[in-house]
């Protein structure tokens, strides 16, 4: 008889975008996901131990976290997800969690100016008691009295110090987006058109910087900028997914330049 949530996670059942080796042990860290889905977040132990190499064991990670040296969106948290800002005041480092073109989590280093805000996708716009309007964001935030022009699927620019909306991006054709789900996760491009299907999912057609077009669901698209310029810096590759032939040519060119050097 099951009694509540499972308290353990086998390493073979962990999400692939965590990039854990199968022979590293029997278990993987069980995320304390909070408002997020457990498969869409990344435990801080994997960041400090596996990515940044600031700790060797789980106990060392716990001692670092208990000293409150790691901030997520300016606060103490133990799990992060897409677009969250990880700050380490002791080392003056700031990171933003993004996807690479293969759908894996990428810890992208950012400057201090960029670490003061984050982009949040609007899930819904509702009215509470006494007709007070509020919006729900993808990371579980509830913000009252938003701009009346903000609608569902738009993106807001949130100041992490004041928790107030400083600007917003409409979900319109011509704006740059990042795909956060499906087989095209991590790709960045501009919205070309929207296809509405009654009784089914709305399809979004996106074109990347190289001219390749692809389609995905409306729920998998996250607007990150107005026009073709994103409001946040992107990791290496700028969200452009190469084909198998293009990757082979790139490796050959790199090998030739290394041989001639």
UniProtKB/Swiss-Prot annotation:
Gene Ontology molecular function, alphabetical: rRNA binding; structural constituent of ribosome
Keywords (A to Z) from UniProt: Cytoplasm, Ribonucleoprotein, Ribosomal protein, RNA-binding, rRNA-binding
InterPro entries cross-referenced by the UniProt entry: KOW (IPR005824), Rib_uL2_dom2 (IPR014722), Ribosomal_eS4 (IPR000876), Ribosomal_eS4_C (IPR032277), Ribosomal_eS4_central_region (IPR013845), Ribosomal_eS4_central_sf (IPR038237), Ribosomal_eS4_KOW (IPR041982), Ribosomal_eS4_N (IPR013843)
Localisation per UniProt entry: Cytoplasm
One Gene Ontology biological process: translation
Domain S4 RNA-binding: 42-100
Cellular component, GO, one term: cytosolic small ribosomal subunit
HAMAP family on file: Ribosomal_eS4 (MF_00485)
Similarity comment text for this entry: Belongs to the eukaryotic ribosomal protein eS4 family.
Protein name per Swiss-Prot or TrEMBL: Small ribosomal subunit protein eS4
Species for this entry: Prunus armeniaca (Apricot)
């Amino acid at each position: 008889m099951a009694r509540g949530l499972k308290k353990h996670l086998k390493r073979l059942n962990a999400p692939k975008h965590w990039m854990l080796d199968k022979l590293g042990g029997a278990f993987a860290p069980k995320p304390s996901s909070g408002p997020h889905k457990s498969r869409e977040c990344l435990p801080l132990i994997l960041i400090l131990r596996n990515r940044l190499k600031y700790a060797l064991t789980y106990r060392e990670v716990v001692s670092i976290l208990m000293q409150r040296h790691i901030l997520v969106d300016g606060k103490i948290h133990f799990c992060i997800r897409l677009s969250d800002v990880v700050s380490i005041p002791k080392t003056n480092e700031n990171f933003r969690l993004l996807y690479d073109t293969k759908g894996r989590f990428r810890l992208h280093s950012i400057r201090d100016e960029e670490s003061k805000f984050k982009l949040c996708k609007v899930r819904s716009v509702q009215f509470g008691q006494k007709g007070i309007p509020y919006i729900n964001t993808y990371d579980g935030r509830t913000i009252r009295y938003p701009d009346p022009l903000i609608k569902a699927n738009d993106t807001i620019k949130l100041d992490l110090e004041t928790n107030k909306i400083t600007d917003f991006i409409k979900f319109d054709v011509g704006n740059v987006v990042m795909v956060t789900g499906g087989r095209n996760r991590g790709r960045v491009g501009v919205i070309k058109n929207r296809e509405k299907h009654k009784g089914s999912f709305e399809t979004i057609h996106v074109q990347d910087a190289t001219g390749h077009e692809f389609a995905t669901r409306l729920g998998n698209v996250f607007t990150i900028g107005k026009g073709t310029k994103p409001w946040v810096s992107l990791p290496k590759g700028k969200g452009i997914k190469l084909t198998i032939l293009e990757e082979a040519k790139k490796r050959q060119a790199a090998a030739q330049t290394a041989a001639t050097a």
